[in-house]
């Protein structure tokens, strides 16, 4: 099995994002700050070389990192 490019926390954040949770809701659910949620999202976008959340989601699905 291939090693995930996402940390467990990044994966949790994106799994909630694709379920239409807001940044605030994700922060509350994972018991972390809004800023930390945004940092996780930014880190993933940097890893993937994409400019937006939607593009990150598409790439993660292509890479089998996320299932919808």
Regions found by a protein language model. Give the residues of each.
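Helix-turn-helix DNA-binding segment
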Residues: 1-34
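Hydrophobic residues on short alpha-helical segments
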Residues: 11-15, 45, 57
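Residues within the DNA-recognition helix of helix-turn-helix
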Residues: 40-43
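Basic, Lys/Arg-enriched C-terminal extension of HTH/homeodomain DNA-binding domains
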Residues: 46-68
């Amino acid at each position: 099995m291939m090693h995930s490019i996402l940390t467990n926390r990044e994966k949790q954040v994106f799994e909630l994002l694709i379920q239409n949770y807001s940044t605030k809701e994700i922060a509350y659910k994972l018991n972390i700050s809004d800023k930390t949620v945004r940092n996780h999202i930014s880190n993933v976008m940097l890893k993937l070389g994409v400019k937006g959340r939607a593009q990150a989601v598409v790439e993660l699905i292509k890479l089998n990192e996320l299932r919808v």
